[in-house]
Amino acid sequence: MPSFDTVCEPNLPEVKNAVENTAKEIATRFDFKGTAAAVELKDKEITMIGDAEFQLVQVEDILRAKLTKRSVDVRFLDKGDVQKIGGDKVKQVIKVKSGIESEQAKKITRIIKDSKLKVQAAIQGDAVRITGAKRDDLQAAMALIKKDVPDMPLSFNNFRD
């Protein structure tokens, strides 16, 4: 029986490259000379540091541009609050989402079941497996998921025939 998995996983090497390119651009830009502006990636968390909140906005704009250039969906980013750290510096942590949360997985299975397609959806950890008798039904399920869940960067893998 044909099946596929619906997952939400970023291309982490490309995220790392985008963060490194952002750090290089910060180091060479004239408006960041002599400031504490920095960006770094540690364990699926991007930390941005700046002298003021407007600098964090500029660093985030650069980061988003670099991610987009490297074909990484910016919906993977989950911004945290701006925190004041020692002196007059501010910091913001951006988490890189990975995996489908349980309530999102339940939403996807509910969408599949309500669609009356001849497919079954099962939650398996941080992925949703869709199984059906025909390949056409699976393709219809893919189109339905992409249309009805626009707020998550979902991808489909592990196709079985």
Curated annotation (Swiss-Prot):
CDD domains: YajQ_like. Keywords: Nucleotide-binding. The keyword Isomerase does not apply. InterPro entries: DUF520, UPF0234-like_C, YajQ-like_sf. One of its GO terms (molecular function) is nucleotide binding. GO terms for cellular component: cytosol. Belongs to the YajQ family. Nucleotide-binding protein. PANTHER family: UPF0234 PROTEIN YAJQ. This is Nucleotide-binding protein Vapar_3769. It comes from Variovorax paradoxus (strain S110).
